[in-house]
Amino acid sequence: MTHQTHAYHMVNPSPWPLTGALSALLMTSGLAMWFHFNSTALLMIGLTTNMLTMYQWWRDIIRESTFQGHHTPAVQKGLRYGMILFIISEVLFFTGFFWAFYHSSLAPTPELGGCWPPTGIHPLNPLEVPLLNTSVLLASGVSITWAHHSLMEGDRNHMLQALFITITLGVYFTLLQASEYYEAPFTISDGVYGSTFFVATGFHGLHVIIGSTFLIVCFFRQLKFHFTSNHHFGFEAAAWYWHFVDVVWLFLYVSIYWWG
């Protein structure tokens, strides 16, 4: 047995970054195959390998943090910096989509009819499903904060209730968004309006699904007493991510649905 004289976690070699990258390649290639050739086989393989990677990577992190005690205060500080930088990178990711939208809408070209929305496009009513979606996500922001406060105060039952409500609202948002896509009077192939609308709201929807998955993992961990009032970075990271998703939706709603 070796003894370390520092507070940092020397991670064992792991296959999950490689399998995660390969599954992402399969998913993006599968998406292109689905769009162009109506074949979902590659996409399904990518999704399956991605789910397997996520399950096993999360399992390893839970073992290292909760059961082996490798997540010392110094390690948690590094993880916090990592999560903050990740969220900043996500902000820049969505900035690109907003840039594309405003670039197209503030000075519409003659090909678009010199107006926005382009000629022939019938935009969705912002006071119907989009407003309900906004209410749902804002309510989920309140419930995740309730869960965090309950955890800090050691109130396990209220934490589980609030977390369950947040997950339910996240799933409800996803179903509403799917129904909106199904009923939309335009498609992703309807010029720059369709492209910017579906890519921006679609990537946001993907982030809601990722955030919901993150919260579901936290819910099951809390059922097994993994979190304490002073050792719960996994939940804290999920809450930060959820608030980020919430704020991005507000910008999407104001920009694309209401103004655009």
Swiss-Prot record:
<protein>
    <recommendedName>
        <fullName>Cytochrome c oxidase subunit 3</fullName>
        <ecNumber>7.1.1.9</ecNumber>
    </recommendedName>
</protein>
<dbReference type="Pfam" id="PF00510">
    <property type="entry name" value="COX3"/>
</dbReference>
<feature type="transmembrane region" description="Helical; Name=I">
    <location>
        <begin position="16"/>
        <end position="34"/>
    </location>
</feature>
<feature type="transmembrane region" description="Helical; Name=V">
    <location>
        <begin position="156"/>
        <end position="183"/>
    </location>
</feature>
<keyword id="KW-0999">Mitochondrion inner membrane</keyword>
<dbReference type="InterPro" id="IPR000298">
    <property type="entry name" value="Cyt_c_oxidase-like_su3"/>
</dbReference>
<feature type="topological domain" description="Mitochondrial matrix">
    <location>
        <begin position="67"/>
        <end position="72"/>
    </location>
</feature>
<feature type="topological domain" description="Mitochondrial matrix">
    <location>
        <begin position="1"/>
        <end position="15"/>
    </location>
</feature>
<feature type="topological domain" description="Mitochondrial matrix">
    <location>
        <begin position="224"/>
        <end position="232"/>
    </location>
</feature>
<feature type="transmembrane region" description="Helical; Name=III">
    <location>
        <begin position="73"/>
        <end position="105"/>
    </location>
</feature>
<dbReference type="InterPro" id="IPR033945">
    <property type="entry name" value="Cyt_c_oxase_su3_dom"/>
</dbReference>
<dbReference type="GO" id="GO:0045277">
    <property type="term" value="C:respiratory chain complex IV"/>
</dbReference>
<dbReference type="GO" id="GO:0006123">
    <property type="term" value="P:mitochondrial electron transport, cytochrome c to oxygen"/>
</dbReference>
<keyword id="KW-0472">Membrane</keyword>
<feature type="topological domain" description="Mitochondrial intermembrane">
    <location>
        <begin position="184"/>
        <end position="190"/>
    </location>
</feature>
<dbReference type="InterPro" id="IPR035973">
    <property type="entry name" value="Cyt_c_oxidase_su3-like_sf"/>
</dbReference>
<feature type="topological domain" description="Mitochondrial matrix">
    <location>
        <begin position="153"/>
        <end position="155"/>
    </location>
</feature>
<feature type="topological domain" description="Mitochondrial intermembrane">
    <location>
        <begin position="35"/>
        <end position="40"/>
    </location>
</feature>
<feature type="transmembrane region" description="Helical; Name=VII">
    <location>
        <begin position="233"/>
        <end position="256"/>
    </location>
</feature>
<dbReference type="InterPro" id="IPR013833">
    <property type="entry name" value="Cyt_c_oxidase_su3_a-hlx"/>
</dbReference>
<keyword id="KW-0496">Mitochondrion</keyword>
<comment type="function">
    <text>Component of the cytochrome c oxidase, the last enzyme in the mitochondrial electron transport chain which drives oxidative phosphorylation. The respiratory chain contains 3 multisubunit complexes succinate dehydrogenase (complex II, CII), ubiquinol-cytochrome c oxidoreductase (cytochrome b-c1 complex, complex III, CIII) and cytochrome c oxidase (complex IV, CIV), that cooperate to transfer electrons derived from NADH and succinate to molecular oxygen, creating an electrochemical gradient over the inner membrane that drives transmembrane transport and the ATP synthase.</text>
</comment>
<feature type="transmembrane region" description="Helical; Name=VI">
    <location>
        <begin position="191"/>
        <end position="223"/>
    </location>
</feature>
<comment type="similarity">
    <text>Belongs to the cytochrome c oxidase subunit 3 family.</text>
</comment>
<dbReference type="GO" id="GO:0004129">
    <property type="term" value="F:cytochrome-c oxidase activity"/>
</dbReference>
<comment type="subunit">
    <text>Component of the cytochrome c oxidase (complex IV, CIV), a multisubunit enzyme composed of 14 subunits. The complex is composed of a catalytic core of 3 subunits MT-CO1, MT-CO2 and MT-CO3, encoded in the mitochondrial DNA, and 11 supernumerary subunits COX4I, COX5A, COX5B, COX6A, COX6B, COX6C, COX7A, COX7B, COX7C, COX8 and NDUFA4, which are encoded in the nuclear genome.</text>
</comment>
<feature type="transmembrane region" description="Helical; Name=IV">
    <location>
        <begin position="129"/>
        <end position="152"/>
    </location>
</feature>
<keyword id="KW-1278">Translocase</keyword>
<dbReference type="InterPro" id="IPR024791">
    <property type="entry name" value="Cyt_c/ubiquinol_Oxase_su3"/>
</dbReference>
<feature type="topological domain" description="Mitochondrial intermembrane">
    <location>
        <begin position="106"/>
        <end position="128"/>
    </location>
</feature>
<dbReference type="GO" id="GO:0008535">
    <property type="term" value="P:respiratory chain complex IV assembly"/>
</dbReference>
<feature type="transmembrane region" description="Helical; Name=II">
    <location>
        <begin position="41"/>
        <end position="66"/>
    </location>
</feature>
<keyword id="KW-1133">Transmembrane helix</keyword>
<keyword id="KW-0812">Transmembrane</keyword>
<feature type="topological domain" description="Mitochondrial intermembrane">
    <location>
        <begin position="257"/>
        <end position="260"/>
    </location>
</feature>
<dbReference type="GO" id="GO:0005743">
    <property type="term" value="C:mitochondrial inner membrane"/>
</dbReference>
